[in-house]
A protein has these predicted regions:
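LRR N-terminal entry segment and analogous cap-like coil->beta motifs
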Residues: 9-46, 52-56
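Leucine-rich repeat
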Residues: 21, 27-30, 42, 50-54, 66, 74-79, 87, 90-91, ...
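Tandem-repeat architecture and repeat-register "anchor" residues
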Residues: 26, 47, 71, 96, ...
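Consensus "Asn ladder" position of solenoid repeat domains
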Residues: 18, 39, 63, 87-88, ...
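Extracellular/luminal ectodomains of metazoan preproproteins built from arrays
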Residues: 1-11
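Conserved hydrophobic beta-strand positions in leucine-rich repeat
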Residues: 13, 34-36, 55-60, 79-84, ...
Length: 191
C-alpha cells in the first residue's frame, strides 16, 4: 500500500487528499477501486493505469487535470465508473479519450470547463448508462450522443451550461433515454 494512502482488504486504495502530483508507484495490479480525488494530478498518459486491468472504480475528481492523453484508459476494460468532475482546467477531450472502456456504466464530467464535445467522444462506450456533463461551458449540443443508441437506460445531465443551440439530430437515436436535464441554459427552442 502506498505510504500516503489507506488500503482495505477489498482491494480498495484511498489516496484522496494525499497531496499527490503523480500516481504512486506501489499500486497493486489487483486493485479494484482507486480513489485519487482532491490531489494535484495534471496530466495522465497511456502508461498511467496500464497495469490496473482489474479496476472497476476510479475517482480522479477535484484534481488539476489539463489533458487526458488518448489511450489513458485503454487498459481499463473492466472499469464501470469514472469520476472526472471538478477538474476546472479540463477544457477539451480528444475523440479517443475513452477508447477501451467497454464496461463503463457511469461517467462524471461535471464542473469542468469543457466547451466542446467531439462527435465521436462517447462512441467507445457501449455500456454507458449515466453521463453527467452539468456545469461546464458547453454552448452547443452536437451529435455526440448518437452513438449511445444501444443503451438500456441513459441519464443525461446537461444543466448549468451555456447551451443556446442543440443539433437537430443530437438525441435522434436515443430511444432508451430515461432522463434528460437541460435546466439553467440559454435555450430558446428545442429540436
Amino acid at each position: 500500500c502506498p505510504s500516503m494512502c489507506k488500503c482495505t482488504p477489498e482491494e480498495t486504495i484511498l489516496c484522496n487528499r494525499a497531496g499527490l502530483k503523480t500516481l504512486p508507484g506501489e499500486i497493486a495490479a489487483s486493485t479494484i477501486s482507486l480513489n485519487l480525488s482532491n490531489n494535484y494530478l495534471r496530466i495522465l498518459n497511456i502508461n498511467t493505469f496500464r497495469n490496473l486491468t482489474f479496476l472497476h472504480s476510479l475517482w480522479l475528481d477535484g484534481n488539476n487535470l489539463t489533458f487526458l492523453t488518448p489511450g489513458t484508459f485503454h487498459a481499463l476494460s473492466r472499469l464501470q465508473e469514472l469520476h472526472l468532475s471538478r477538474n476546472s482546467r479540463l477544457t477539451y477531450l480528444h475523440a479517443n479519450t475513452f477508447r477501451g472502456l467497454l464496461n463503463l456504466i457511469s461517467l462524471d464530467l461535471s464542473h469542468c470547463n469543457i466547451f466542446e464535445i467531439h462527435p465521436l467522444l462517447f462512441s467507445h462506450l457501449p455500456s454507458l448508462e449515466s453521463l453527467d456533463l452539468a456545469s461546464n461551458n458547453m454552448r452547443y449540443v452536437p451529435q455526440a450522443f448518437r452513438n449511445l443508441s444501444s443503451l438500456t437506460r441513459l441519464n443525461l445531465y446537461l444543466n448549468n451550461n451555456q447551451i443556446s443551440s442543440i443539433s437537430d439530430s443530437a438525441f435522434l437515436y436515443l430511444n432508451k433515454l430515461h432522463f434528460l436535464h437541460l435546466s439553467r441554459n440559454n435555450l430558446s427552442s428545442l429540436p
